Amino acid sequence: MAAFLSVLFVFANLLFPLQKASAEVMDHTKYQMDWSYSKSKKKPIRTELIKTADGKIAFCLNVDLKSPSGQDLPEMGKVDINVYRVLLNGYPQKSPQELGVSDWREAHYATQLAVWNALKQIDINDLDFRNKNVEKVTKDIVAKANASEELQEITMSVVPSEEQQAVLKNDFFETGLYTVETNAKSGTYKVQATGAPEGAKFANEKGEAKTEFNVGEKFRILIPKQTPAGGFSFKVSGNLTKLQGIAHKGTPTIQNAVVLLERSEEKTSPELAVSWKKANGHDNKPNKPYTPNEPHKPNQIKR
């Protein structure tokens, strides 16, 4: 019976393999610094360079615990928004030169101090800085992070959102341009119509008809001019990607860590509407403009 159950267990695992939670193997490299001293903790504040197996830089989330040394740390979800804003304004998202220093270690150390400050594990105003470059960069990162309104969550909206009336231009009724507003850094979106007439299409700013658009592209709707008056609805569905601060769980002795990773999400807009009317009530030719200063003149006979 036990042998039968063992075979059954192996067979079940082949059919339904267990899903392993996302994780990152992290290790650290020491570098020498004696750049700040905590007056409240009565000790220097030190850090190390933490990297994932594929070379991404991670930051410590527990000032008093040890750095990872080859452990496989599972994901915990998105990090605190204040830490996220620090990461966007610190190293390595900004180069040492952009941060105002020439040494990557100063840029890295300043970013780590700003992370701990955001978590309220240290207070940069409590530190006795022994390196003026580090002091300036740390305070600059904290100030920019505090002023930031950047969100981790991916947002998407379509403008305009009100019903649009397409107007006749040459062979098509055309809407104005729609803009897909998003904080995603990359991705694509599709426009999905419900009840659209034959020949209706979506085109970018260059007039190219497309079924899929890149983030940053605008689109308009084109309806053939012979189409009877009417309307239809549509929605925009996007597959969008941006950096998010993903926290990874340590152990009672190994610190939690955070690394910026690209994450993708599906987003769908509410239903939008477009309509059009037949020109002149009978055909789709535009009305000739009325010119009151040029009245019709009957033929006149010269005397």
Stretches with model-predicted labels:
Residues 240-246:
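Short acidic/polar inter-strand loop motif in beta-rich domains
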Residues 162-174, 300-303:
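Short, solvent-exposed loop/linker segments at the N-terminal edge
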Residues 213-228:
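Short, hydrophobic beta-strand segments
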Residues 228-234:
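Exposed beta-strand face motif in extracellular beta-rich ectodomains
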Residues 185, 192-216:
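Low-complexity "stalk/linker" and mucin-like segments enriched in Ser/Thr/Pro/Ala/Gly
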Residues 20-23, 250-303:
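Intrinsically disordered, low-complexity repeat and linker tracts
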Residues 1-20:
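C-terminal segment of classical bacterial N-terminal signal peptides
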Residues 22-147:
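Short, surface-exposed polybasic-aromatic patches that bind anionic ligands, especially phosphate groups
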